[in-house]
Amino acid sequence: MYLEGYPSMNNCFSTSNDINNSRPLDVHVWSDYPEFNQLVNKLWVKYFPSEDSTVRPGPKSKATSKVHFKTLLLDLYVCWMTDPNMYLGVHMSNSGWKANSRYNALHLSYRMIGIIKELVAEDVLEFQKGRQGTLSRIRAAEQLQLLFRDLKFPVSEVVFDYLRDPIILRGMSEEPDEMEVQTSSKKLKKPTLEYDDTPETIRMRGVLNKYNELLNKKSLDVFSLEEPYFERIKKKVGKEEKDVRHYITGRNHFVRRIFNNGSWELGGRFYGGWWQQISKELRPDIMIND
């Protein structure tokens, strides 16, 4: 069994540059913990003193620049608390940000790109540029890691999956070009589709929201583990295999339903809970509420 804690003084800095140790930036995290808000305000004034008065052309984002910054800083902190070596994958092109999507409840937009670039220029973030088919990677640089180390902010005060929609509709797999067919063994990605609610989607969302609320009130653990993760072998490209870590922290409790090929009649399976990835050997060790 593991206990939530802070990285030790000796282990609070990044020591590995493995960009495969990463996860996507989570745009559905939030917290109003006072000490964290103080850090947000301090860094905002330091690095973006005139941002709120800047007038930009084009339609205005529903989320302020400061909300973008706070969400980014919060997920960087959660990532660092999980593993100081871990990176976050981020879109650095405007097309990767859909502010009005139902799958982006905080309405974050391509404003995030400018904020990331400024923090990289100020050596607040480490940055690894993405290659074809991969996202760019960021993580807290040493000066930000030092601030995180001194921040007494328990992850239990973070709201995960904030306003996140648990009902997802995906389209058909994108058609590969000839080169992709020859060089890649990855499954083709299905695009996420926008949709209009129906009485049935509203009903399904209500059921899942209640289920996820129940999960958030419970403590889920694997008593035989000394660290908050387990590893499973996952095939990557060609014959190469890699152990992939699945964390059993609160950010991996959210359960969603995914429908396929643009139809509510196809798919509908449940995904998201870390317990769905656990081995049969560890399954008997799952513990609820100690």
Residue spans for each PLM region:
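Extended repeat-based interaction scaffolds and adjacent low-complexity, acidic/S/T/P-biased segments
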Residues: G5, L72-L73, L88-V90, E118-L119
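A short, conserved structural fragment
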Residues: I116-G133
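Pre-recognition alpha-helix immediately N-terminal to the DNA-recognition helix
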Residues: K70-D75, G114
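Acidic, glycine-rich two-metal-ion catalytic cores of nucleic acid-processing enzymes
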Residues: Q128, L135-D290
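Long, low-complexity, charged/polar intrinsically disordered regions in eukaryotic proteins
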Residues: Y2-S65
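Charge-rich, solvent-exposed alpha-helical interaction surfaces
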Residues: L39, I115, V207-K210
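Generic recognition of stable, solvent-exposed alpha-helical segments in well-folded globular domains
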Residues: Y110-G114, R203-G206
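Helical catalytic core of nucleic-acid polymerases
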Residues: V27, W44-V45, P49-K60, T64-V67, ...
